[in-house]
Amino acid sequence: KKAAYYKLKTGMNPGFEQKAVIFNQPQMDIRIQPKGILEEAKWLETANFHGIEPYQQRYRRFFFKEFNLDNPSEIKKVTLFMYPESKCILNLNDTWVNQEVKPNQLNEIDLTGYARKGVNLLFASFPFVEGKKQFAARVIVEYYKYDRTEFSTDSSWLTTDYYSNPSLTRVFPQPVAPVVVDKPGYAESIAYNTFKEWRIQVPIDALENLNNIYMRINYSGDKAEIYNGYMLSDDDYNSHATWTVGLNRQEHSVEGKELTLVIYKLDKDEKIFFDLPANGTCLLYTSPS
């Protein structure tokens, strides 16, 4: 690229002399790709029966997931996103989750009131049914300090078959690794309208010989967040102005990282306070219903 500038010339004939500087414009390969709500989840087999014996009529297949919420900040919200192909019930920390899980659709289950700091144990219970059935799930934990952690179904969700619900006072078969199956053909079409996600891949040498790189983002939605791993790196409330993000101004380095961009609607009772204008008037934005 070529840029022009003017230099003051002194002497007998003072004036401004035009100069030019030539520089190479770096080619940035920062890729952004949409991310499905259950894209990273493995699909686990809940049934594969061509006939159920009479003694198995009351049997259920259980899936167990132990997880630790050890972030020092208080828990703000815990949400389970689950797509099962058959009915199931949920239990978290020895308490049955009083929310219906509907088959053949994406369920959003609020687990906030059941979760606790430290070790948690979640299990899902599926009755034996004929045919092949499967499910996928994802848990997102939000903290008041704006950190976020999540996990999805994988081979760590141990499973066992039994005729009664597990409890501390009852012996039941030792859980084993689940059967991981191929994603169904409709998996890519599973969508969630409250928020959408994208992956942002930053090259490892993106900032080499540069002071900064700016991403300029225009989006449709009420709020946007960028996560670097589990930590909130930047956010923006949509005021219909271009959101400018300086990659070298983030608290933690983003070079060589995969960032997550989240854009979502606000709750109906959410309030946004913008910067105080010059005349001292207070601006308050309430999300439309």
Show the residue positions of the predicted features.
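Aromatic-lined ligand-binding clefts that engage carbohydrates, nucleic acids, or primary amines
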Residues: 17, 67, 71-92, 122-125, ...
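Exposed aromatic-hydrophobic patches
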Residues: 108-112, 244-251
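A glycine-anchored, Pro-Gly-centered beta-turn/N-cap motif
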Residues: 116-118, 255-257
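Short beta-strand-plus-loop segments that form exposed binding edges in beta-rich domains
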Residues: 124-130, 263-268
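Conserved small/polar residues in nucleotide/adenosyl-binding loops
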Residues: 285-289
